Each structure stands twice: as C-alpha cells, then as structure tokens.
Amino acid sequence: GELLRTLKAGISNNKIVFSGVGKTSEELEYAIKKDILQINVESLDELKLIIKISKKLKKKVNLGLRINPNIDAKTHSKITTGTKNDKFGLDIETAEKIYKNYNNNPNIKILGLSIHIGSQITNINPFVRAFSKITNFIKKLNKNKIIIKNLDLGGGIGVRYNNERTISISSYAKNILSISKKLKCNIILE
C-alpha cells in the first residue's frame, strides 16, 4: 500500500503518519515494525487491534486519535468526512474516554490528534470551526496533564477547476499559525 511505497521512495519512517479507515492487521503490523511517527486511530476497535499487535510484537507504538469534530465542510456529501453521520474518526467524548482508559497502557503512547473534515473545501469557515474545536479539546487535555505532541490537520482545500471560488493559501496558513501559537505541539499537514 501507500506506506510501503512511501518507504521505498526514501521517506524517513520518523516522518510518516499512517491514516485512513480500513487498515488491515498486516498493514498495522508492518507500520509498527517500521517505527513510523504515528498511526492515526479511527475507532475503538482499531485501537484494540493495534494494542493486540503491539503486544505480540513487544513494541510500543505511537498513536494519534482521529477526532470527528462534527463540522459540516459544506462540500459534496460523498467527500465530507467530519460530521457525526460520517464513519470517520472518534467523537470527542469517546476520545476522552480513550485517554482516561488507555493513556497508561504499556503498549501504546497516544501523542497526537488528527482531524480531517473533507475534500474540495472552498470556504475557510469549516476549517476555522474545526481548528477551534480541536484547539479547545487539546487545552482541556492539557489541563488534565495530557500532552499532545502532534496535531495532524487534514482536509482538502478546494481546487479551482473553472472559475470556482476557493480558499487562499494565506488565509489557511494564517489560521494554522494562530493554532500553533496557542498550542505547544508539532503541526502536521497532509
């Protein structure tokens, strides 16, 4: 898959984040063996599978939790990924429970959060709302002595195929800089 191709292309394993729904046991085992930067967890079932594999391999694995911020990106229904009706990611309440119940698990280290609200997004407002929600969640975790090292901000800026209006890169960057000033974590962009 993509992970193997990325490594074959010469990308350093400590720069690779493995994301996406439907990761197989074999893919997860390969990612854990390769000591990549982090695996973004989509569900509680996937978390349990990762723990089982890391226990078998006797390796501690770095994880990020993919948060579904319940933000409508106002894009085509087939490419939106950030509302509660979408199958992607964990709601904030579930993520809080995972931190409470799994943060001291010897097989994993939860060091990141991830969001991805959709593709072909042509308005900055959904990003602003999603980034605000994830920032508030990180601040809440920090108050509980949970430190987030990596924040993976996903979602696709709309491409101009004809004369469609889209988001300016400078506007997007301004919002990310605002987050990075408020939080003490690495910002990862996909």
Over which residues does each language-model region extend?
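Anionic-ligand-binding alpha/beta catalytic cores of soluble enzymes and soluble regulatory domains
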Residues: G158-L189
